[in-house]
Amino acid sequence: MAQFYYKRNVNAPYRDRIPLRIVRAESELSPSEKAYLNAVEKGDYASVKKSLEEAEIYFKININCIDPLGRTALLIAIENENLELIELLLSFNVYVGDALLHAIRKEVVGAVELLLNHKKPSGEKQVPPILLDKQFSEFTPDITPIILAAHTNNYEIIKLLVQKGVSVPRPHEVRCNCVECVSSSDVDSLRHSRSRLNIYKALASPSLIALSSEDPFLTAFQLSWELQELSKVENEFKSEYEELSRQCKQFAKDLLDQTRSSRELEIILNYRDDNSLIEEQSGNDLARLKLAIKYRQKEFVAQPNCQQLLASRWYDEFPGWRRRHWAVKMVTCFIIGLLFPVFSVCYLIAPKSPLGLFIRKPFIKFICHTASYLTFLFLLLLASQHIDRSDLNRQGPPPTIVEWMILPWVLGFIWGEIKQMWDGGLQDYIHDWWNLMDFVMNSLYLATISLKIVAFVKYSALNPRESWDMWHPTLVAEALFAIANIFSSLRLISLFTANSHLGPLQISLGRMLLDILKFLFIYCLVLLAFANGLNQLYFYYEETKGLSCKGIRCEKQNNAFSTLFETLQSLFWSIFGLINLYVTNVKAQHEFTEFVGATMFGTYNVISLVVLLNMLIAMMNNSYQLIADHADIEWKFARTKLWMSYFEEGGTLPTPFNVIPSPKSLWYLVKWIWTHLCKKKMRRKPESFGTIGRRAADNLRRHHQYQEVMRNLVKRYVAAMIREAKTEEGLTEENVKELKQDISSFRFEVLGLLRGSKLSTIQSANAASSADSDEKSQSEGNGKDKRKNLSLFDLTTLIHPRSAAIASERHNLSNGSALVVQEPPREKQRKVNFVADIKNFGLFHRRSKQNAAEQNANQIFSVSEEITRQQAAGALERNIELESKGLASRGDRSIPGLNEQCVLVDHRERNTDTLGLQVGKRVCSTFKSEKVVVEDTVPIIPKEKHAHEEDSSIDYDLSPTDTAAHEDYVTTRL
């Protein structure tokens, strides 16, 4: 295949080697640019600064050059998290480009802050974003800094950007037909979809919601619901949208985890944001929890804090209920269940009485309703047993006593469903599958009652049941009543939700029903296909003569595939093995037809039994396992829905007492009629300003309390998120890389400090020497006419016999050499021990007038290793000659070998009282061999000898050194 990718030379042999070359070659970097980028990579601050300064002067380096990986110097510094280099590069106005996005992706908060505060030069050309070439950029055009920061979920970076006033585009709906959406989708549908996904991914960031949303709970609820709906529409990005939806749900749950008291929890769960300040609202109706159930926020609802509050309200009348023995619980529930008629009558007569208030408790209400439904099932059982039998041959039998007792329950169920639909709305009503089951059950009972009435009115004769018509109203009513009994018994499963053991099982059963419906759709298609084929094959062989029973339900099955309906029944019952194989035979000797029919029948059984049935088992197993993995959350969510239905104010009385008008219901009815029918005659009394003001104040107080609690929750959540991130971070390869980078940067910083200290010390020495020269020239007047300029450094060697001995002992030197460092003014009291402080520097030798000629050769010491022995010997001989004359001449001398050495600069100040010595700082730098101009020689005289000594400064023009001897001290200046 190589010939498809590489050009082959015609004259080359067949087994020639494939030449390789770089097809997409890029421009090479110059050595200076490579060194510049390498210095940035290693964190060499001094080299980078030097390169940037040279680039401004000589223009030899492109400071915006790119390495083979496509990184500029700024991006390399951001990747290495070197804030000093980033600040340096920005000060030289390097090209920023996507540096802010790279810093956000790298989560370098300091770099992001520097880039946000960096102001571009006014002369820089501003290119519109639409004209920028984004082909080689790592980020798509729709990625803005705030969107990328939200993707990384870095709270600090998001806060910095939000403080700058950034904004996020509002995503349009999937079915939006505006001009912008239509044009964007037509131009590039993929970019349009990815852009919407990136925006939603940013909006779903927990840090962004916590920082910018006034009501984070409501934002998380609505966004998770919207993302869940988007996952159903955009199947291409279904997994991404579902993951974002789960992220929003988890954020709401984690935020609720931060509540620390029941007061905070009640403020959160009772907050209502859909009312204005002047509208009256209840402060204890769990409005936020109802909203969470509506948006199916299972993690939020099943959160332990929320469940604890619900449980405390559920068992309000029975504190410590869960700690009681199960036998005590059962006996208590049984007694309350038996007394539910008494409680109901008391509530009808006196709703505000103790018993009337007792039945309004959620737990008591649940027990009473359950006892009422169990009584209804008991009546159904009695009706099915026909205890009070009537004449079975009567075509229109009258209702029995049990049926008369069942009728109030049926009417009570119907009235309860009507009230529920009226209060919650049709949409909320049909979303609950149990309501649909109740609707079917009540419809069957209504149809049964109607048919019973028709049969009782129309048919009164006695006829044997065998002679009745197939569609006789009594027969149809009995069939519908039997089906309704099944639904009524199965409806009891909904009460299993209250139990922790049966609740998860009931939820798994409901999920399996969905799998069964999916399976039935495919199975019906297969069933209809084979039924059509078999009926087409056996239609011509229908048997009608000599048969007392026709069909597959006969003792001897026949005509199994004669009609389409009969074929469907035969194929269905064949799954359970109830159809014999001989039904594929025909009376005629048509073996081919029998073979084809048997083959079709066998193929159907293989597909339905082996494939489809096992697929159904696998689907049901998967659904059960899914529920089992989240059994606690699913069960608590279902139980909360059951509890919330009993927390409502209405529906206190159980069936059948709910059909009896209570005094409260009659009062509400009269009030409604009076308001709607007589509203023209009477005007509504306006509320006073005081009432409106108090209501507004209460609502405003609730709002402020909610915002205060929300502020505390957000702070706790952010702190917990940061702690968790630090805990889970651990040691990674990236950390090791950062550590190496820090070590490298520290190394170059130390080297830079050493080089910088050399230059700074030289400059300070020059300044100090210049000042000293000026002072001397002013004090001496015009006695010395011409003096040469101060040299680059001023080296002073102080010689004292005792000090030299001490220095020799401490430094293991034969001549006690050391350097003198200048003391700051605040440390003048330590001048006595200055030799110990400067023992590692310069030239220090001991001189004495008595034995100068003997010790001179052994007391000269050189710090620089580059000074040759010959130069040292020559300097020694010259010094001996000068000392033999009693003075040292002054002049210009070339000092070789001081290429890289440390010297100490001595600065002396003259006062009227004393001659003080200030020891200069160490100078470490690189010097070339140069002429050193020595201006004068100043003796250093102790205080006690100051009165006996005179200024012996003597000028010499061409002497290599200038030395003045004063008793025990000799001053030598180069």
Curated annotation (Swiss-Prot):
Ranges for region Disordered: 765-787
GO molecular-function terms, A-Z: beta-catenin binding; cadherin binding; inositol 1,4,5 trisphosphate binding; store-operated calcium channel activity
The entry's keywords: ANK repeat, Calcium, Calcium channel, Calcium transport, Cell membrane, Coiled coil, Disulfide bond, Ion channel, Ion transport, Membrane, Metal-binding, Phosphoprotein, Repeat, Transmembrane, Transmembrane helix, Transport, Zinc
Location within or outside the cell: Cell membrane
Cytoplasmic compartment residues: 1-324, 360-362, 419-432, 499-511, 621-974
Residue span of region Interaction with ITPR1, ITPR2 and ITPR3: 615-974
Residues at which Zn(2+) binds: 172, 176, 178, 181
GO cellular component: basolateral plasma membrane; calcium channel complex; caveola; cell surface; cell-cell junction; cortical cytoskeleton; membrane raft; plasma membrane
Extracellular topology ranges: 384-403, 454-475, 535-599
One GO BP: gamma-aminobutyric acid secretion
Record-listed Ca(2+) binding positions: 417, 420, 435, 438
Residue stretches of biased makeup (Basic and acidic residues): 773-784
InterPro entries, alphabetized: Ankyrin_rpt, Ankyrin_rpt-contain_sf, Ion_trans_dom, TRP_dom, TRPC4_channel, TRPC_channel
Reaction(s) catalysed by this chain's protein: Ca(2+)(in) = Ca(2+)(out); Na(+)(in) = Na(+)(out); Li(+)(in) = Li(+)(out); Cs(+)(in) = Cs(+)(out)
Region PDZ-binding domain, residue ranges: 972-974
Pfam families tied to this protein: Ank (PF00023), Ank_2 (PF12796), Ion_trans (PF00520), TRP_2 (PF08344)
Disulfide bonds: 549-554
Family label: Belongs to the transient receptor (TC 1.A.4) family. STrpC subfamily. TRPC4 sub-subfamily.
Protein name: Short transient receptor potential channel 4
Organism: Mus musculus (Mouse)
Taxonomic lineage: Eukaryota, Metazoa, Chordata, Craniata, Vertebrata
Gene (UniProt): Trpc4
